[in-house]
Amino acid sequence: MMILITSGDYVDNELKIEFGCIPPCLLPIGNRTLIEYQAEILRKYEDKCKIFVSLPEDYQLTDIEKSMFNDIEVIIIPVPANMTLSESVLYSLNIIYESYNDNEKLFILHGDTLISHLHLEGDIIAVAQSDADYNWEKEKVDNFVWCGYFSFSRPKTFIKYLTLSKDSFVHAVRKYDEKYPLKRIHVDDWLDLGHLNTYFLSRSRITTQRAFNSMRINSGIVWKSGENSKKIEAEAYWFKNIPSMMKIFTPQLIEDGIDSKTKKYYYSLEYLPFNPL
């Protein structure tokens, strides 16, 4: 299977203020980038899939980023600046299909999108319910919006419609849908990181706990426990004993103790949606 992650432009201005001028797939989440999560999920479903990502051709990758792309085996396609999404996708697909079998199903995942449970059947559009007032493509019923994941069993036909609809990716998808109906697949775990508000909301739902720890974030509170109770207790002690003049710079400890169900030590903190250093 062939997968294109569309990340050929830079993040919007609000996100640029926070993170600088970067492509959306390189947005940080904890100690990783978004594309590392995307590639990990895709490989979980299909280990041998070929993953491509479009990046602005004027973006200068750091040595760390180059190493990361090599490690996760994602092939970079540099695309010219100032292209529409439709033009960028068409440009990328023309490069891909010069070298690879064009009979394989094509999957497209937007670079600012994370979906944990993917469907690998052909000819689908992933949709989700949303009341947010963003420029997402909407279906006619039930407030369903397109959430950035598509598949096409006839890539050549989709490329033809992209060629005829260079100014509108949506129009190309709709034209394909008229000829080969695309099944709407409802997803409950869509995370959109393409806007500042949705980025912080999404990030709070992706914890970075290690295997021996348990962490959850809910209603503005971080709850943490783990196998090593002494370590968890020591962390809680640290928060309890921060000098008063320093507490303004740290999240407030809400409670700590022994969990009644697991019998393990835990503590909970105020959740502050700040970016890590």
Task: Label each residue range with its predicted role.
Residues M1-I22, L26:
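N-terminal nucleotide-binding beta1-loop-alpha1 segment
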Residues D9-D12, D259-L277:
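A glycine-centered beta->alpha junction motif in the catalytic cores
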Residues E40-K48:
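Short, acidic, metal-binding catalytic loop of nucleotide-sugar glycosyltransferases
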Residues N103, T113-I185:
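Conserved core of the sugar-phosphate nucleotidyltransferase
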Residues K224-K264:
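A conserved alpha-helical element in kinase catalytic cores
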